[in-house]
A protein has these predicted regions:
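Bacterial Sec-dependent N-terminal signal peptides
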Residues: 2-34
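Short, conserved catalytic or adaptor-binding loops enriched in Gly and charged residues
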Residues: 224-228, 248-251
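Short, charged, surface-exposed secondary-structure boundary motifs
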Residues: 127-128, 220-221, 245-247
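Extracellular/surface-exposed low-complexity segments
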Residues: 5, 19-23, 233-259
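Consensus positions within tandem repeat domains that build extended binding/scaffold surfaces
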Residues: 83-85, 105-108, 128-133, 151-156, ...
Length: 259
């Protein structure tokens, strides 16, 4: 009899464990009028990635992504924006991202054509492939000092983007990152850049102010700067001008000036 009682208690405990909120893998919840799907990133933790499921034609204007969400009595921390989370949501004009977000996954905001402003937090470390591709109304975007990884084509065809500054935390600009940014006027690269990928600034013909303070020319491809004005003044460290003049990719430019 005692064995049966112990077994019964064990089965109850197991059932309670299996129903624990931390065993949930995904759930839906609504915040500020927007319905989202939340997926637990690592099993048995309370960190989740968020994806919008409200239909795109019903979501317009400003969107504020929540930093936390409560489901079945458990608080979950929203730490990632999922793959294609808002892709094609062409009515969104402004996006506020909470300070809990560290990763924006691939194509998260792709073709959000009305998006003019994105407020992103300092802890953000990763922007995925093609995350903001085709955000043709986006005029300004500041890469925070916490950014350490950009994905391929992340700002491709952001045709209203006018300037970009790369923080010292970032060592690589990937292929096609700013390809087709036809309004881009200013590029500022700090001292720690190592590589700039194929077609990273392809077709950025409107750039008039280009500064790269990295002493050794970052590794580039022959097409990295293709389509830019070859005669625009490029500011580099005074002691390294000749290195830039002869480096692959950088030899595209004819007008170097020292700083």
């Amino acid at each position: 009899m005692r064995i049966k009682s112990i077994l019964a208690l064990a089965l109850v405990a197991l059932a309670m464990t299996n129903c624990s909120p931390l065993n949930i893998t995904s759930f839906n919840a609504t915040s500020n009028g927007v319905e989202y799907k939340y997926e637990v990133i690592v099993p048995l933790t309370n960190f989740v990635r968020v994806t919008a499921i409200t239909p795109a034609d019903q979501l317009t204007g400003e969107v504020v992504i929540p930093s936390t969400v409560n489901y079945d009595g458990t608080n979950y921390v929203v730490s990632q924006i999922g793959k294609s989370a808002f892709e094609g949501y062409s009515g969104i004009t402004e996006m506020t991202i909470p300070s809990t977000i560290s990763v924006i996954e691939e194509k998260a905001f792709r073709n959000c054509t009305a998006l003019r402003e994105i407020n992103t937090p300092q802890p953000l470390s990763t922007i995925g492939d093609y995350a903001f591709e085709g955000c043709s109304s986006l005029e300004n975007y500041s890469l925070q000092a916490s950014i350490s990884k950009l994905g391929e084509g992340c700002f491709r065809n952001c045709m209203s983007l006018t300037n970009v500054t790369f923080p010292t935390s970032l060592n690589n600009i990937p292929a096609k990152a700013f390809e087709g940014c036809t309004a881009l006027e200013e590029i500022y690269i700090d001292r720690n850049m190592l590589t700039i990928g194929s077609k990273a600034f392809f077709g950025c013909a409107t750039v008039t102010d280009f500064t790269c303070l990295t002493p050794t020319p970052p590794t580039a491809n022959s097409d990295t700067f293709e389509g830019m004005d070859a005669n625009l003044p490029v500011t580099v460290p005074m002691a390294n001008i000749e290195q830039y003049r002869t480096a692959i990719g950088w030899s595209y430019f004819a007008n170097y000036q020292g700083q």
